[in-house]
Amino acid sequence: MAPPVDGGGARYFGVYPALVTDIVDQDGLGRVQVRFPWLGTDGDRDVRAWATLCSPYADDQQGLEILPEVDSQVVVAFEAGDLRRPYILGAAWNGTTTLPHSPEAANNIRILRSRSDSRLEFDDTAGSAKVSLTMASGHQIILEDAPPQITIQHANGCVLRMTPAGSIEINANVSLDVTAPTVNVTAPVSTFSGIVQCSTLITDAFVVSPAYTPGVGNIW
């Protein structure tokens, strides 16, 4: 691509820091407005431009959309060195902003954390890998390798867990409601520790009970 004709103005090659000033592109092009503090901020020297945001996946009505926060620091480069054509290559922590997780030598943690403290975390610890999705309220989904299980937990303590033994445990604080036109249970034995109550019971074979009064056709 031929460089823009701009009267032979200065060219800026390499990468430069910039500060985000606006993320709502009125032209609908998905650009982000940035300011270049290193060019000065006095009067006419407050230089700003709408920058194209680079993404690992961008296509028509699809892609990865994660916009930087206003006032956050980003790293930009300029097409053919033209100050009017900036591209945001990524964001940067700069000392005033801190990482969402303190680094460790083992480098096992990968994390995506939002402003409201919602987190998607990958733990690559050898022998006990884990993926977790959590919210500040306490809701969480955890996939673990050690023990190999999956847990879905509500902030109020209700839990759905798929265990290493192959069982599924559901713990509800109040009730467990199932609504469907038909519910089919296929099992050699179904065990209930308390009272089983129903409006109509139809059996195809026998009812074994210390106290039972059958109706016509073995309908209760």
Where are these regions (language model features)?
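Short boundary/loop segments of OB/S1/cold-shock single-stranded nucleic-acid-binding domains
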Residues: M1-L19
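Alpha-helix capping and helix-loop boundary segments enriched in small/acidic/polar residues
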Residues: G7, D59-G63
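Right-handed beta-helix
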Residues: P17, E65-S72, F78-W220
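Acidic-leg catalytic submotif of subtilisin-like serine proteases
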Residues: V20, F36-W38
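Short aromatic-glycine-enriched beta-strand elements
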Residues: D27-R35
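A short macromolecule-binding patch
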Residues: T41-A51
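Short, structured beta-strand/loop micro-motifs enriched in basic residues and often containing a Trp
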Residues: W50-D60
